[in-house]
């Protein structure tokens, strides 16, 4: 039994001696396909529940550990009943199309911080177009030579610049990234 254990340990050492950690930061251009969840905050959270949607995120290395990002997607916020001047109002669902660009910096092998700015377009009358900003962080878990699973979180705000309420959300993204 001891010989079997020793042989297994030796085989394990040789089997993994050539394994290198994969670095998600500099693996070349890649495209990520993700599912997104948003949790509305503040006054926006009084009117809307959880949002669900999807996104495409392109990354291109521009320096050591630094990637340019371009991101587009769709989110649907489900409306909820709320009180306005003593009257119960049912909010209609809100669909938005965020389009953003930014930078992703890898702090460690697969852990990153990012910042994006852009525009968010409402799919219904009355929302219009708003300036979007989104700082975040996350991790990419390499699963193959040019493929990774990404888990990210961000704060996102959309402002019109006219003094109206700025919708704010905490967003989560689960994505599959693949090299191009």
Label each residue range with its predicted role.
Residues 1-28, 180:
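Cleavable N-terminal export/targeting peptides
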Residues 20-69, 75, 167-180:
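Short glycine/proline- and aromatic-enriched beta-strand/turn motifs that initiate or cap beta-hairpins
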Residues 26, 78-81, 133-180:
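Predominantly the C-terminal beta-signal and adjacent terminal strand-loop region
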Residues 31-35, 70-72, 101-103, 113-115, ...:
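Membrane-embedded beta-strand positions of outer-membrane beta-barrel proteins
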Residues 37, 60-62, 74-76, 107, ...:
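Short beta-strand segments enriched in hydrophobic/aromatic residues
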Residues 39-47, 73-97, 121-127, 159-170:
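Flexible, solvent-exposed loop segments that connect beta-strands
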Residues 64-68, 110-113, 143-149, 180:
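Repeated loop/turn-to-beta-strand initiation elements of outer-membrane beta-barrel proteins
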Residues 98-136:
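Surface-exposed, polar helix/loop patches in the mature regions of secreted/periplasmic/lumenal proteins
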């Amino acid at each position: 039994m001891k010989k079997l254990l020793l042989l297994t340990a030796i085989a394990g050492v040789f089997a993994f001696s050539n394994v290198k950690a994969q670095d998600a930061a500099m693996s070349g251009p890649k495209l990520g396909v993700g599912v997104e969840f948003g949790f509305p905050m503040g006054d926006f959270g009084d009117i809307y529940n959880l949002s669900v949607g999807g996104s495409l995120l392109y990354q291109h290395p521009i320096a050591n550990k630094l990637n340019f990002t371009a991101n587009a997607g769709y989110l649907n916020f489900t409306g909820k009943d709320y009180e306005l001047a003593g009257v119960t109002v049912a909010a209609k669902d809100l669909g938005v199309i965020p389009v953003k660009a930014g930078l992703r910096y890898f702090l460690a092998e697969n852990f990153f911080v990012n910042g994006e700015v852009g525009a968010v377009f409402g799919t219904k009358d009355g929302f219009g177009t708003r300036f979007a900003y989104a700082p975040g962080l996350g991790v990419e878990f390499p699963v193959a030579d040019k493929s990774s699973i990404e888990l990210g979180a961000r704060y996102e705000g959309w402002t019109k610049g006219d003094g109206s309420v700025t919708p704010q959300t905490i967003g989560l993204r689960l994505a599959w990234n693949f090299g191009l």
